[in-house]
Amino acid sequence: MTVKYQELFIEIAKRVGAEVTQVENLQAAAKYISNISKGTTLVPETPLATKHSLRSLLTAEGIDVFIGDFRKAGHMPEGGVTFCNFCMADSGTVVLESTDENIRLATTLPETHFVIVDPEKILEDNLAAVPAMTAMHEGSEPRFVAYITGPSRTADVERVLTIGCHGPRELHILLVNNISTDLMEN
């Protein structure tokens, strides 16, 4: 986990269509999000969201944070905000343990997905991620793990590239230092 991997991650993530921005702290991240997400925003209740009072920070910036079962949000939410477990620099991929349905919905329903990443969680490649993936799957319960590389895109039947057809049109990765170095925590 070095700056070398952070630079590679930024380069590749941008190449696959993500916006990557270094922000000073979570307050600055909330401000950034408020400049883009003007409507209802989904923020799943995760250990890191609770630990860092993410919902309160976003609400203080004027963001309409939906609380509850995201299936009942009532209309298409504009934004979704999540933390990640770790990233893989060589593909610009963000990895989230998404067994909780609200996490999955926050990453797929909105037009814009914001992912908060501690740069210490950027691994070199998928081989470096094997120990974390192994630990993630320990235990008897199956888990859902999402690999997100850029905004949603498809070129189905007619081979015409469409952005945002099966998920967010935009992916914003916000690099924030000192959030968490625990690869199991999101």
Predicted regions mapped to residue ranges:
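The feature marks the mature, well-folded catalytic cores of soluble enzymes
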Residues: 1-186
